[in-house]
Amino acid sequence: MTIIIAGKNTLTLTSLAAAVLALGACGGNSDPFESKNTKPAYLGAVAIASYDGASDDLLTAGLGKTGLGGTAPAVADPLKPTPAELRRLAIFNNYRAILDISTNGGYGTLYGPNVDAKGVITTGEGKIAGTEYIAYSDDGTGRQNITMMVQVPASFNPANACIVTGTSSGSRGVYGAIGSAGEWGLKNGCAVAYTDKGTGTGIHDLQNNTVNVQNGVRTDAAAAGKNSIFTAELSASERAAFNAATPNRFAVKHAHSQQNPEKDWGKWTLQSVEFAYFVLNEKYGDLARDGATHLKKLTPSNTIVIASSVSNGAGAALAAAEQDTQGLISGVAVAEPEVQLAPDARLSVKRGASVLVGTGKPLYDYFTLANLLQPCAALVSPATNAFNTVNAATATNRCSALKANGLVTGTTTAEQAASALAALVAAGWQPESNVLQASHYSFATLSVGLTYANTYGRFSVKDNLCGFSFAATGAAASATPNAPVPASASALATSFGASNGVPPTIGINIVNNLSAGGPLLDAASLSAGGVQDYNIAGALCMRELATGSSANAVRVRQGMSEVVRSANLRGKPALIVQGRADTLLPVAFTGRPYYGMNKIVEGTASRLSYIEVTNAQHFDAFLAFPGYPERMVPLHRYFIQAMDMMYANLKTGAALPASQVVRTVPRGLTGAVANPIAASNVPPIKTTPAAADQITFANNVVTIAD
């Protein structure tokens, strides 16, 4: 077996076999039908590294609780970071990207490396020793190269075996779930099965033809070959022509792989579990009679497997459970899942006087609607919007453009803004999201929508879909303000450790190629007549791909149809937790209809509970932004509890909670500073909720406690 050595204190799978050969030879095995452990055919070479839990570790890369809460770790040579330095940066940035790393917000008290599996606050740094295995899953072409990783903590006990899946959230790389499913699994002595699900830090610098390889290092695309995380499908002549027409641009894997990986997120998640079983049985299985292979000691019959993660990773976990024909998954516990359902008018969801019929909207549909309306809606209450960075003058022009296109009503800007916000609420956003719309437009909406337009339609980077491209842009005070420029060499070199997989990231921005006068940073670009309106033409083009009849729209909707889920969890116990104020993946389009359709599809076999948390939203990391901490509580606290409850159910048969609304208490302010979080702000999920907090299903109607 080919082995790539990665990191320090390394060993190989074949050496593991040799190490236990003598023991295996002593006992023998008279069973003529040995169940041998075999490497899945889709797995490439396996890189293995062991970490001592002091100088380096699985959870914090040696940084510990203090280091994760501090400044980014230094790189000796920013132009030539080592694989170990890139790994450390990736763990640092991915951990912090999904959690609030502030003491007042709960880091170090409610959660964090120093808080043990029982929730006890310790004085330690929370470093976890163990072994890490990394490999590609691929079909042999090198075009898929789905990164798989298994972390096995030193505390893993094969007599008490458990595996937790940690498919990455967003478009993140393989360490994307380190702070969610990863931390919970490692603390509880479980192996953690991660995958980047075909997204991740695959950044192809088309001008210089460099890419990331599996360990994050950047190199020439030709030299990387099949070890590249992602290389755009362009011939040399196509790349030269593209560079001549649009220099200094980038292709990014999730957007430009032309494979619509979301359709296979369940498959990749199941493969990560199979990889985990392979690794564990190589490590703990007895030797077969041939003296070379190992037997399958750990199987679904003696191992608890929880499909988990958050956001896109949560959606992948649900998809995996739906597709699990081998019984690999024991139960599901996820937070804020990105999940899409086929239209079904049998279902209704009722909250107070509001009733929505059907299964919500597909992701690309509601993102393109938000991309049109959010900047105008931000003007309803600009002084009270959380972390509002929307430019008022540009947003005013967007309101005017929406009115001209018949998308809002009103004669004044205030009336048009109110109309835009009302349209968002009517579509399904909860009123609790109103003050969060501005921040989501600034930091998420266009970037996510554009990525999904490209991936669903399987567009190439050379298509410049809707006139958009990805490039670094000049600073406002530079000689080329907001125009495409060469990217920072150090930012590219360290991209594996810092990128989230969705531009804007590591200084690579979204560019409007069609801006009047030449390509510019999209937010600063000029529409007809030199007007700045957040590129209304680009927003309308993206919307047409969701609702129109063009050839490109047909391509996008075909891709959208490939990612719908069935809501059939095959009778597995499952918990979904989601924040009521989720503005990225609104509950009306995700958790609520999924719960209802699961009840319709599975009937009395359903074992899914849906937990909706008030004063919680999608990005716990946003709790560090102005306007967020006094209003919102960390959803992560409830993810941890859901995992604890699912594990207890699978281990001891403990009852799972009924579906419910958990009513939290905002922290509020003392002066201008958010109060420290206390246990009273985040009451626990109850096994049996009060009648006024119940979420119920009857006669195809989900009723949400108001």
From Swiss-Prot:
- EC annotation? 3.1.1.22
Q: Which residues form the signal peptide?
A: 1-27
Q: Name its GO BP terms in alphabetical order.
A: butyrate metabolic process
Enumerate the subcellular locations listed in this protein's record, separating them with semicolons: Secreted
**Which of the seven top EC classes does this enzyme belong to?**
hydrolase
Q: Which GO terms describe its cellular component?
A: extracellular space
Reactions listed under catalytic activity: (3R)-hydroxybutanoate dimer + H2O = 2 (R)-3-hydroxybutanoate + H(+)
InterPro entries the record matches = OHBut_olig_hydro_put
Q: What is its main location?
A: secreted
| Pathway(s) where this gene product acts | Lipid metabolism; butanoate metabolism
Keywords associated with the record: Hydrolase, Secreted, Signal
Active site location: 311
Any one GO molecular-function label of the UniProt entry: hydroxybutyrate-dimer hydrolase activity
Q: Which family does it belong to?
A: Belongs to the D-(-)-3-hydroxybutyrate oligomer hydrolase family.
Function of the protein: Participates in the degradation of poly-3-hydroxybutyrate (PHB). It works downstream of poly(3-hydroxybutyrate) depolymerase, hydrolyzing D(-)-3-hydroxybutyrate oligomers of various length (3HB-oligomers) into 3HB-monomers.
Q: Write down what this protein is called.
A: D-(-)-3-hydroxybutyrate oligomer hydrolase
Q: Which organism is it from?
A: Polaromonas naphthalenivorans (strain CJ2)
